[in-house]
Amino acid sequence: MESRGPLATSRLLLLLLLLLLRHTRQGWALRPVLPTQSAHDPPAVHLSNGPGQEPIAVMTFDLTKITKTSSSFEVRTWDPEGVIFYGDTNPKDDWFMLGLRDGRPEIQLHNHWAQLTVGAGPRLDDGRWHQVEVKMEGDSVLLEVDGEEVLRLRQVSGPLTSKRHPIMRIALGGLLFPASNLRLPLVPALDGCLRRDSWLDKQAEISASAPTSLRSCDVESNPGIFLPPGTQAEFNLRDIPQPHAEPWAFSLDLGLKQAAGSGHLLALGTPENPSWLSLHLQDQKVVLSSGSGPGLDLPLVLGLPLQLKLSMSRVVLSQGSKMKALALPPLGLAPLLNLWAKPQGRLFLGALPGEDSSTSFCLNGLWAQGQRLDVDQALNRSHEIWTHSCPQSPGNGTDASH
């Protein structure tokens, strides 16, 4: 075996160091590696309680007993928007919110000293664990991410012990007032996980509710949209991109990553007649049907976009190089056009109302007229839907609860 002298070894180490520094400058930023979850740590909690602004847990603190004025936690998410935590002594004139918008931390603050909304720091919606700390120092609020100070707000607060209302509430994953009361509204529900959290001064804590999140954070995830069996999202057709007028045309695209079971994938209809036009999964085939007439099918191929194109005379189902067309009878055109004319016209994703469906599936996206739809913006959706993540293994997400 060839041996290297001290000089050669030193040169090799110097070369490796220079290469590392070079890649760091080119964007391979060095990040602190957070330790993995220990068996002694409490389990991570999921931050979403479903649609709406309901928090998963609420804690109350006696500010007259506060000696520690900082809170810290680790958060992991693929979701670019939502509330991490909210705090107040009075929801009308003294409140604070830390959330994400476009993947980056955002602080909203309203009190006697300041009213502001400010975003700062790196994107946190990359599916990794990030350490976050919020501190109060005198009249300042500090935000640290992964050990680095990313924001310092001066002259925005007084001492906690001088608050007119000496009881502070902290809510996780939601708000204690309507989302419209925020200075800059956002979608409160955050599809993310939180662990190793420490809130203010434990000695000053008066009460704490048990977390009510619907999902376990033990499952490794990838970005996407996951619908467990029997779940659905419902969009008003007037709230999504509209059909092309001349000639009339409308398209839907599904990026299927995982699929199992049998049942509906999507449908166009009304609450009274939800399946005027539908796609459902059966025997590893995607079946297109219109009303009670004959349908057509394509073999299920995961990873290729599944596209549905509607025109005045036919519906085309395609995936990759395979394509089939379903002719529409002349009498079928009026109900199709009426779906967009009626306020109750709907796009259903997943199980139909009242359907006993065993289908579970993961999408890397859902598009109408080429524009991505956000499940958080659905008219209604099941609480159990994973709005921005999918289990890495198909079987792991079917039991989504703790």
UniProtKB/Swiss-Prot annotation:
Molecular function GO labels: androgen binding; steroid binding
Cross-referenced SMART domains: LamG
Keyword terms of this UniProt record: Disulfide bond, Glycoprotein, Lipid-binding, Repeat, Secreted, Signal, Steroid-binding
Protein's name according to its UniProt entry: Sex hormone-binding globulin
Tissue specificity comment: Isoform 1 and isoform 2 are present in liver and testis.
CC per GO annotation: extracellular exosome; extracellular region
Domain Laminin G-like residue range list: 45-217, 224-390
Gene symbol of the encoding locus: SHBG
Species of the source: Homo sapiens (Human)
Subunit structure, interactors included: Homodimer.
Outcome following mutation: residue 356 to N: Generates a N-glycosylation site
SUPFAM superfamilies membership: Concanavalin A-like lectins/glucanases
Free-text function comment from the UniProt entry: Functions as an androgen transport protein, but may also be involved in receptor mediated processes. Each dimer binds one molecule of steroid. Specific for 5-alpha-dihydrotestosterone, testosterone, and 17-beta-estradiol. Regulates the plasma metabolic clearance rate of steroid hormones by controlling their plasma concentration.
Secreted is among the record's keywords: yes
Signal peptide location: 1-29
Superkingdom of the source species: Eukaryota
